[in-house]
Structure formats: C-alpha cells, structure tokens
Amino acid sequence: MQDKLIARAKELLSEGKVQKVVGWKKGLFDDDITPAVFATAEELDKDFVFNKYCKANLSKYLVGITRNIETAKSTARMNNTMAKQRDPNAQDKPIPSEVVLVFLKPSDTYSFTQLLKESRITRDDVYAVGVPCQDTVDGGDVCGNCAGKKPVSCDEYIGVDPEAEVAPNTARMEEVAKIEAMSVNGRYEFWRNEFSRCIRCNACRNVCPACTCEKCVFDNNALYTTQKVAETSFEESLFHIIRAWQ
C-alpha cells in the first residue's frame, strides 16, 4: 500500500495537479512516525511511510496549510489592486494557485468533513485521497469502537471502497444506552466521577479533530485557566463542558 500511495503522489505532482503532499514521515525507529509535508518525488522516496504506526489524523494540519494558501492569494490580489491605483495601466501579476494532496484514513475523513462545514479548510485547495485504516497499534477499544470505517468527502480512494456496506457497530452504543437510562442525578454523578479523574494534561484538547482555535480559552493567564489541577468541582466541570461544546 505504501508503494501505491507514493506512486500516486508522484503522479499528481508530475501532472501539476498538486504542489505538496501531506503524509507521514519515518523517524529513527519504526514506530517514530510524524506528519510531514513533501514537495518532491525525491522527498517521497526518501521519507514517506504508511504503516500501522501512522496514527496521526492529518486533517487538522490542513487548517494552517490552506490558510497560508488563501493568504498568499489575498495578498496577490491586494497588490494588484494597489498597483492599479498607482498606475491604471499596470498589468496584474498572476494569483498564486496551490493544491495540497492529503491522505486520509476513514475515521480522519469525518474530521475533514466537519472542518469543511466550519469553513476551517478551503476545499478547493485540497485534493483528498482516502486510504485504508492500517489497524493501528494499540488501537484497542478506540479502533474497535470506531464508527468511521466508511470514508467520505474524498476526491479518490486507494485500497478502500466508499460504496461498500459497513456493518453497524452496535456494541459501541451499549455504554451510551446505560448512561441514557440513568436518572438526571445519576448521570450527573457519573460525569462528576469521570471529571474527577482529570489531571488537565490537555491531551483531549490537543488530539480533538475539531479543536482548531488559534488561542484556547484555557491558555488564558488572565482568567487563571492555565492551571493544570482544578481547585474545585466547578472548575473541573467548566473545563469539560466547554470542551464538549467546542
């Protein structure tokens, strides 16, 4: 599968359909995989990797990448307008156009779709390719309970069939059904108990596929929200309720 992805990325680069590729880069060890941007076929051959350690969801990286692309376009348009104001005969300079290729696992495509709905990603700047889930190591209950096994919103698919029927995972809703069956007070106590385990490491915020704020409210020193351990149950609830509604 890795060879197929590299070959397709090279093809799109050589045809000029994309100018950059967002994928995964190998590190010193087999499991040392990090997201990376590739611009040439040589870089792809040297560092691109796709295996069971490619856990990172690449969709969030598109927020910054497409923003930079759109900023370059806006700057070029503004420069052309200002040039015309100085000299009505001035020739417009070309508006830069760039499309980035991104590989998305089935579950990642749902994050991609949500960010599109929130206008956090410019769709015209992205060529999305759906790829199969590699059954990532240590997926455990997370991958086993995943509801996003059917890729969506991609321009093409490699190794996955977007039309294939996926059997619903009914087991993942059993815990939800138990919580919904509780009384209001019972649900409150359940979540209070869950919140009490929080050490405010911010891992849930950082990994959340929909969290894309430039400045998080919980990084505001003026509001005393940067402290790690909540002093009261109210602070615990505040953090998680805001996280749930972001």
Feature-to-residue mapping (PLM):
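Iron-sulfur-associated redox domains of electron-transfer enzymes in respiratory
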Residues: 1-191, 195, 209
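Iron-sulfur cluster-binding cysteine motifs and their immediate structural context
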Residues: 148-159, 197-199, 203-224, 246
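Ferredoxin-type iron-sulfur electron-transfer modules in oxidoreductases and energy-metabolism complexes
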Residues: 173-196, 213-246
